[in-house]
Amino acid sequence: MLSITIEALTSEGGDDIHLHAGGQGVWVARMAAELGASPVLCGFIGGESGAVLRPLLEQMEVELRLVETAEGSGAYVHDRRSGERVPIAQSASMPPSRHEIDELFSTTVAAALDSGVLALCGPYPGEALPLEIYGNLVADVKANGTPVVVDLSRPRLDSALEGGPDLVKINDWELAGYIEGPVDTEQRMRAAVQKLIDAGAGAVIITRAEEPAMVVRGEEAWELVPPRFERGSREGCGDSMMGGLAACMAAGLEWEETLRTSAAAGAANFLRAGLGSGSRAVIEDLARKVELRPL
């Protein structure tokens, strides 16, 4: 989607207006590319906002496999002049046609098999893709031996779980929905994670805002503890972690190195204003400081 940001140019007044390609898929792909992967971005594009968005996407080190849609691409405007991100406007999203959905589905499956991993992310808010698309994507990609990592909210996540993803990234408040109560103890968190595993997840990473992420795979569990920073923004940190996971899985790295790198990618994003951004050199330095604490 097209992101329009208003920032203060100087303390004396005046505004600075930025146009960026945005959306979870864009931020994940950007971080994966920074870490040396060759991501392929699949999605819809169209309308006036799409005409502005395409050249911004083409500036990224990402292969584009975009499906033209009769409806416009999503766009939103937010104001950062106060130092906080304040939403001003967001365009409505119209449902794509059956033909457009079919084209995106087949394009995504082919790209995943070519790339070696599928990172399945949330759509533009309000985008009405049929729920079964998510489970079908996971199942078809997995059937060909390609790993899948997902970062989705319910009910899309429930559909994806039916396909058996290798790894699910979820935050603690969304995880709480699986046991209808807060995941405020390790016991309750493990109970909620078990629901995801029983539904099809191979492993689960739970992000917990300022608390260390928790990782569960099989009978093993860890806290994932990156360096702690006091001032920064958590916006985009989860997407940077997702990009790190996808890049490391595509490269076939060992599990612990994958976890350390993805946690470092999220920590690096915390220090920056740009979503899904970070320096590979900084991430590699921070990864050496990440602790994996067995639970």
Show the residue positions of the predicted features.
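Positively charged, low-complexity intrinsically disordered leader regions
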Residues: 1-12
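Short, small-residue-enriched loops and turns at beta-alpha junctions
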Residues: 94-96, 124-128, 156-159, 177, ...
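Short beta-strands and strand-loop turn motifs
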Residues: 88-89, 115-123, 151, 169-172
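Substrate-binding N-lobe of the ribokinase-like
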Residues: 13-74, 286-289
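Conserved phosphate-binding/catalytic region of the ribokinase-like
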Residues: 158, 186-295
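Conserved phosphate-binding/catalytic loop of the ribokinase/pfkB sugar-kinase fold
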Residues: 79-117
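Conserved phosphate/ATP/ADP-binding segment of small-molecule kinases
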Residues: 132-219
